[in-house]
């Protein structure tokens, strides 16, 4: 499998330094992608870089994932208009361990193969590096003129950020350049890959290697992922879509991919899955014949959810989706954990009832008309119940005055009322 050709048909090449393809054709290459460790989970904004490493390893090359412990303590001017918070070492090590666990779902760290993946942290070689070392081994090789010419620096200096550009952030490209030099010298790493906004920082590294060692190193960047409508990829109203289920439930994760537009699904299935070209071309053709069936979105959501979470989590997410949009049973509803239940019914009207009152038993008509405004009147409710149009926890309400107790609660806390086909209400016992 040819790595560059694989990335090209997937739309994952933005810039590539001349000679990169020739290098990859003649030897097993070691390359790295940098990962920001400011959180203890990756989010889907990291996935393009991770998938590049995955394809790289599948093509027989050796991937390094570099945790930017030292650089993460500083900040990067290439895309952030504001400086980042600093990390302490304990937090950094915790975040690193969590991130490696997530990366292990994409990369082989464990085998004895010569191209097994490695995780490195630039804090390990920067923490003892003095300012005098830095000035002598890095600073003297790169001119300020060279640094000022970088697009990311120009933007900050030209007033895009009110606070200007600190010296710390200005030197970021030298620190990242030194990472490349260090990995070149210690790991034989000849290629750095990253998002297109990193081109300036990466080429500082190739320049540093050339000027200090007379060595040849290379750069490859992928496009920044966008949405067809111009919106920011990977962000929702509630923030990032995280890989850690503590921050984004598998159900919400699955729903994110399921709900992308047709145009985005066609691009994302190439970038975020390992499906081969023939299969993806077949899926696109099938989708174009019947877009309303959302074949691409369903397959994309399945592949990414299984890869990041598990087959079991994927099946649970599908079942949860069917509760809202299909003919699910009360048994399926009862299987939902509290987080998924709340995620599925996010935004539906909510009402509260006293747990004590419910323990004694409350007639449905009193609960749904007087306590919770599910119905405007008892007459309206009676008519709908008689027509089989009212359900409690996905079971048809048997009678207008059916008694509801704490035994009916889901997760010992919730009652789900459905009026007609599409109107849901959540009653919370407190």
Curated annotation (Swiss-Prot):
CDD domains: TyrRS_core. A motif ('HIGH' region) lies at residues 37-46. A motif ('KMSKS' region) lies at residues 232-236. Its EC number is 6.1.1.1. It is found in: Cytoplasm. Keywords: Aminoacyl-tRNA synthetase, ATP-binding, Cytoplasm, Ligase, Nucleotide-binding, Protein biosynthesis, RNA-binding. Belongs to the class-I aminoacyl-tRNA synthetase family. TyrS type 1 subfamily. Homodimer. This is Tyrosine--tRNA ligase.
């Amino acid at each position: 499998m040819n790595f560059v050709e694989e990335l090209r048909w997937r739309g994952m090449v933005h810039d590539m330094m001349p000679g990169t393809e020739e290098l990859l054709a003649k030897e097993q290459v070691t390359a790295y992608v940098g990962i920001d460790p400011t959180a203890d989970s990756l989010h889907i904004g990291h996935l393009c870089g991770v998938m590049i490493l995955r394809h790289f390893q599948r093509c027989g090359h050796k991937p390094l994932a570099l945790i930017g412990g030292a650089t993460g303590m500083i900040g990067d001017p290439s895309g952030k208009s504001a400086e980042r918070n600093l990390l302490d070492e304990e937090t950094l090590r915790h975040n690193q361990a969590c991130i490696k666990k997530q990366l292990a779902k994409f990369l082989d760290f464990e085998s004895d193969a010569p191209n097994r993946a490695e995780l490195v942290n630039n804090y390990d070689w920067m923490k003892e590096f003095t300012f005098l070392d830095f000035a002598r081994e890095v600073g003297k090789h790169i001119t300020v003129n060279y640094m000022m010419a970088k697009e990311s620096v120009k933007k900050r200096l030209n007033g895009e950020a009110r606070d200007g550009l600190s010296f710390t952030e200005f030197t970021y490209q030298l620190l990242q350049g030194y990472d490349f030099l260090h990995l070149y010298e210690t790991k034989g790493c000849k290629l750095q890959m990253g998002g297109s906004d990193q081109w300036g920082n990466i080429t500082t590294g190739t320049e540093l290697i050339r000027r200090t060692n007379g060595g040849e190193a290379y750069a490859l960047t992928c496009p920044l992922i966008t949405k067809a409508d111009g919106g920011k990829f990977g962000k929702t109203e509630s923030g990032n879509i995280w890989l850690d289920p503590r921050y984004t439930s598998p159900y919400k994760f699955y729903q994110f991919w399921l709900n992308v537009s047709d145009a985005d699904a066609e691009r994302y299935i190439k970038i975020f899955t390992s499906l081969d070209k023939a299969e993806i071309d077949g899926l696109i053709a099938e989708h174009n014949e019947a877009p309303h069936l959302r074949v691409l979105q369903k397959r994309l959501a399945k592949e990414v959810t299984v890869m990041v979470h598990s087959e079991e989590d994927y099946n649970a997410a599908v079942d949860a989706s069917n509760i809202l949009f299909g003919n699910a049973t009360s048994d399926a509803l009862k299987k939902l954990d509290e987080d998924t239940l709340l995620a599925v019914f996010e935004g539906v009207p909510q009402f509260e009832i006293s747990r004590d009152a419910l323990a004694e038993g409350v007639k449905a008509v009193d609960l749904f008309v007087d306590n919770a405004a599910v119905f405007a009147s008892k007459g309206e409710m009676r008519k709908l119940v008689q027509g089989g149009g009212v359900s409690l926890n996905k079971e048809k309400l048997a009678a207008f005055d059916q008694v509801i107790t704490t035994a009916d609660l889901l997760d010992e806390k919730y009652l789900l009322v459905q009026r007609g086909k599409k109107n849901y209400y959540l009653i919370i016992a407190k």
